[in-house]
Amino acid sequence: MRAAGIGGICHQRKRGRHRPAPAPHEDLVRRRFVAEEPNRLWCTDITQHPTSEGRVYCAAVLDVFSRQVVGWSIADHIRAELVVDALQMATWRRRPEPGAIVHADRGPQYTSWVFGHRLREAGLLGSMGRAASSVDNTMIESFWSTMQRELLDQQHWTSKAELATAIFEWIEAWYNPPRRHTSLGNLSPTEFENLHTAATAAA
């Protein structure tokens, strides 16, 4: 999938028998998913879904301000580079200012040295909820539920490449640009951010 230019999926939760590692970051969010502007608070997580060829995994980074997916990665593995690739896409696209918060769970990918290193390189602050607590990352859990309902459960997926392409198209061509959210005043994430940008420029 990397050769095809498609980089890291999971609503059937990734948690298995592994005991969660001690959190290297405190919980800076405490279930208060509120941001006054873009690129101040991101949340990130992994989901997975089966195909006839095996599982596909997706990591996503969601901007709390607009619910826009600012970074994602799709792969056939769940190693730490899956979440690092999603973070790198987000930082490359958005260029967040130092001190922006990235909130995750305590999965081994997010407690890994390499993920923490990438956060420090970008000047970002890591934040982690409690182990095995979906309510501590509820916004991105809601995003996965939407993807599950609108895309993943709509058909049987024959190949990993087929599903990876469908996820890419769902995020970039549907979820971000036109899909409307009642929580955003019936605007899409892209429309909501554009409105904020225009209002800020006019102020």
Language model regions located:
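Charged DNA-binding/catalytic regions of mobile-element recombinases
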Residues: M1-A203
